[in-house]
């Protein structure tokens, strides 16, 4: 199951955990309050997992691929890592399922503070359209993840500030309706 916490303001190595001191864990309920949902699945059975099939059907995730992020497998590795870590939003939900390895998704809470979400094998997460976020590997420098989409894939990131998009406006409206 994913683990989450509030981050410190350090600019040291982004691959480190960056816990606030004292630590401030973030619960799954707190993640849901910012629109982030998570699932724990059996990554060893992803090709035939009925639970994954059910999630895909219920959410109309009709397209998927698998990406491996490692210096030996991802073209333009260093450049891609910088792009992934730039704070941005998407106009569609972002769905990721970790099949191997581990990494961090960072998302903003209602007060614009960073929440770090640690994901490892078997963890699946959905980030709502319009949420500011970023991704980085952890110190293992490796992740293999399934990317899921409703319809054709769109990977266009809109770097912050991107408040003028309808997806962002809808997300901000969602935040005002949650406790």
From Swiss-Prot:
Pathways per UniProt: Amino-acid biosynthesis; L-methionine biosynthesis via salvage pathway; L-methionine from S-methyl-5-thio-alpha-D-ribose 1-phosphate: step 5/6
EC number(s) per entry: 1.13.11.54, 1.13.11.53
MF terms in GO: acireductone dioxygenase (Ni2+-requiring) activity; acireductone dioxygenase [iron(II)-requiring] activity; iron ion binding; nickel cation binding; oxidoreductase activity
CDD domains noted in UniProt: cupin_ARD
Disulfide bonds: none
Binding locations of Ni(2+): 88, 90, 94, 133
GO term, biological process aspect, one: L-methionine salvage from methylthioadenosine
Keyword Cytoplasm (UniProt): yes
Pfam annotation, one family: ARD
Binding locations of Fe(2+): 88, 90, 94, 133
UniProt-annotated location(s): Cytoplasm; Nucleus; Cell membrane
Keywords, alphabetical: Amino-acid biosynthesis, Cell membrane, Cytoplasm, Dioxygenase, Iron, Membrane, Metal-binding, Methionine biosynthesis, Nickel, Nucleus, Oxidoreductase
GO cellular component, one term: cytoplasm
Family of the protein in this entry: Belongs to the acireductone dioxygenase (ARD) family.
Known partners and oligomeric status: Monomer. Interacts with MMP14.
Function: Catalyzes 2 different reactions between oxygen and the acireductone 1,2-dihydroxy-3-keto-5-methylthiopentene (DHK-MTPene) depending upon the metal bound in the active site. Fe-containing acireductone dioxygenase (Fe-ARD) produces formate and 2-keto-4-methylthiobutyrate (KMTB), the alpha-ketoacid precursor of methionine in the methionine recycle pathway. Ni-containing acireductone dioxygenase (Ni-ARD) produces methylthiopropionate, carbon monoxide and formate, and does not lie on the methionine recycle pathway.
Protein name (database record): Acireductone dioxygenase
Organism: Xenopus tropicalis
